[in-house]
């Protein structure tokens, strides 16, 4: 109980004073790993679904890199350009671990992320890396992107529709547990979630967080299906779908 109390305290500090300091992040990871070791129903593992591919693209032509990672427990994704962080983070979802504490957990699925290179020019040529991290292991896939020619006539993207850059593609979790469906955008947006063409409303079971994530408590078999995350602003919207699969309940360890 001391470990869970300390983890709860660290989570409060993290949420109150982001970004997370290295020492605090290390402490959270250590305690989260202890929870995983005691309650995960399968060993930790992580895999790149499809590696990035190197590309030669014309200057000024918007280009997207996509990265999908299968993992237990669920992974985070961040992107690097020539070794420097440019998008995402490696902060784990410790809040869900707290909500499921003391229960057997599956915490398995696929997360996806896209990195958009807007109006690229020669300075955008280089090494792009997608890095997946599940608290136990780190995995990386790399692409060399070369920009050929100059960019011209590029428009500012300050007044543009949002883009969903990180989301849960699929998630397996045990019935009776909490499951988080992740959805993050590249700018401040209004969030909407749909299920079976119906609006998901905040209540005792469903909570849409300010960062876009959907938290579903006490999942049951009837919760299985496709959920649609929608990010909106005054210039348009973006959508991504995720599939939730509740698994048969097992006894706590």
Curated annotation (Swiss-Prot):
Residues 1-16 form the signal peptide. GO terms for cellular component: extracellular region. It is found in: Secreted. Pfam families: I-set, Ig_3. This is Zwei Ig domain protein zig-4. InterPro entries: Ig-like_dom (IPR007110), Ig-like_dom_sf (IPR036179), Ig-like_fold (IPR013783), Ig_I-set (IPR013098), Ig_sub (IPR003599), Ig_sub2 (IPR003598), Neural/epithelial_adhesion (IPR051170). It comes from the Eukaryota.
């Amino acid at each position: 109980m001391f470990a869970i109390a300390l983890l709860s305290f660290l989570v409060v500090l993290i949420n109150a004073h982001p970004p997370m300091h290295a020492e605090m992040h290390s402490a959270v990871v250590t305690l989260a790993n202890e929870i995983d070791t005691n309650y995960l129903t399968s060993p930790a593992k992580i895999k790149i679904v499809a590696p990035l591919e190197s590309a030669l693209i014309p200057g000024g032509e918007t280009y997207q890199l996509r990265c999908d990672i299968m993992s237990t427990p669920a992974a985070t994704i961040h992107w690097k350009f020539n070794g420097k962080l440019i998008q995402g983070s490696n902060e784990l979802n410790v809040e869900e671990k707290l909500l499921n504490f003391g229960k057997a957990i599956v915490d398995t699925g696929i997360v996806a992320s896209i990195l958009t290179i807007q109006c690229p020019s020669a300075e955008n040529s280089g090494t792009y890396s997608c890095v997946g991290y599940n608290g136990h292991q780190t995995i990386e896939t790399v692409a060399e992107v070369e920009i050929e020619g100059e960019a011209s006539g590029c428009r500012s993207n300050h007044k543009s529709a949002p883009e969903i850059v990180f989301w849960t593609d699929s998630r397996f979790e045990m019935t009776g547990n909490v499951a988080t469906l992740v959805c993050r955008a590249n700018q401040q947006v209004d969030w909407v979630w749909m299920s079976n063409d119906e609006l998901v409303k905040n209540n005792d079971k469903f909570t849409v967080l300010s960062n876009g994530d959907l938290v579903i408590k006490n999942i049951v078999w009837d919760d299985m299906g496709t959920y649609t995350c929608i990010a909106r602003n005054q210039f348009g919207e973006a959508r991504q779908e995720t599939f939730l699969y509740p698994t048969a309940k097992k006894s706590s360890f």
